[in-house]
Each structure stands twice: as C-alpha cells, then as structure tokens.
C-alpha cells in the first residue's frame, strides 16, 4: 500500500492510496479534483473511490466535479452535508478495496459527522495508516466546532489512541510548526517537542510535508494526547483529563499564530479559481 501525499490550497492535504499489485487507488479528501487527477494519471492508477473525513469545503468541495469527471466513482462519508455522497458509512463499518481494508472510525467533535479512516493491506508487513482529517494533527488536534471536550477526549484516547502505536498518521492540514510551538509553551522542558519542532522547521524550509507521524511519536510530544502528564496539568491548572483537554483547546485557540511563509501550493487555489466566488463583486 503506497500513500501519495498531495499538498493543496493553503495548507491542506489530499491523499492517494494505491494498491500496487492492481494499480487501483482510493483518495482521501479530494478537495482539488484537477490536482488529484494529475497524480492519478502520473501514477497510472484507476481511481475507484473517495473517502471524505468531513463536509468542510477545504476537504469536500471537489466531490461534485470529481464525480462528473469520473462517472461511477464512489464517494464515502458519514455526514449528509458531504456533497455527491454515494455511500453513507457507519461507525466501525469496514470497507474493502481489493487488498486494502478500511475501518471507519467515528470521531465527532470538529464536526458532528467527522469520520477517520484506518487502513491496512492484507498480507502486507507495512504499518497501517490513519487518515485523521481534522481530528488529530501532528502535534495537535482539531477545534471543537460542533462538539465537546468530552467527545474529543474519547476520540483521542479511545477511538484513535487504542490503535497500534506503529500506525502512521496522515492528517488533514500542514500545521505542525505552529502546533509544536504551542506544545513547547505547554512543556518547555520536553526534549521530544524540541527535537520534533527543529525537524519540522527544517522540513518547512524545504517545502516538504511533515506527515506522516506515528501514534507512538504523538504520545511523546502532542499535548492533547498527554493530558495525564504532570507538566501539562500544571500548565492548565487542571487535574481531570477532560478538563485539561478543554483548557488546552482554549489556550490553543488564543495562541498567537506564528508568521509562516505562504505555502507554495496556496497560489494554485487562485490559478484554479477556487476563491472566485469570494472575490466576485456584488
């Protein structure tokens, strides 16, 4: 199972998961169809389905166009607000695409219909992959836009946290540097945070992605997975894990975003007219 990381818009990621023996492929969060189909042609694969983590435009806006360009394409997701949806999936439902297996992990909070996708390939020794959308990021987690701290705690500690620690994490956005800057504020003595931040800055300087991480790594430097650690509790002034998580999210929401260089893929959004509706004169 090969995963192609595709940078689009300002800081989004799409993914193309390829079964190398058959050259069939499944995409995750196909927001920019033209870019996705460029990669499909370059890799010489057949796109069979699209898995959508949630309905937000920067993850799902390309569905209608993609279905038009690829007749018969299946679009999977859990939220009725997802455009061009052909298959509504249920929590813990398993899907099969050739040798690629998918378990649908329901993680409501960022949106009420958010679904993560846990993938592995039958007979392969490769580590499984988690496509976590806007629930779990490298060094962070998504905002609680339609849910609660209790829900996110369950998502992070049980639904995702119980997966094999070698699982590779492919998240929905490139926000690692700013996440780890916040993590360093929370745990200024955490050497794992310092090391990962230095690495992420180097990757950013080279316009390279910081995905995937692994679940095992995330438990070392991601404060939202470290709510039982003394240093994290001291930072928040809370002891109960859900309250620690709630306080962390509030602090992160108010954390000043560092000035980052514009991602080179951001300008492609203008080239493809993605912002045209917002720029038209009224």
UniProtKB/Swiss-Prot annotation:
Its cofactor is Zn(2+). CDD domains: hydroxyacylglutathione_hydrolase_MBL-fold. Binds 2 Zn(2+) ions per subunit. One of its GO terms (molecular function) is metal ion binding. GO terms for biological process: methylglyoxal catabolic process to D-lactate via S-lactoyl-glutathione. Zn(2+) 1 binds at residues 54, 56, 110, 134. Keywords: Hydrolase, Metal-binding, Zinc. Its EC number is 3.1.2.-. Disulfide bonds: none annotated. InterPro entries: Clx_II_MBL, HAGH_C, Hydroxyacylglutathione_Hdrlase, Metallo-B-lactamas, RibonucZ/Hydroxyglut_hydro. Zn(2+) 2 binds at residues 58-59, 134, 173. Hydrolase acting on ester bonds. PANTHER family: BETA LACTAMASE DOMAIN, HYDROXYACYLGLUTATHIONE HYDROLASE-LIKE PROTEIN. Belongs to the metallo-beta-lactamase superfamily. Glyoxalase II family. This is Hydroxyacylglutathione hydrolase-like protein.
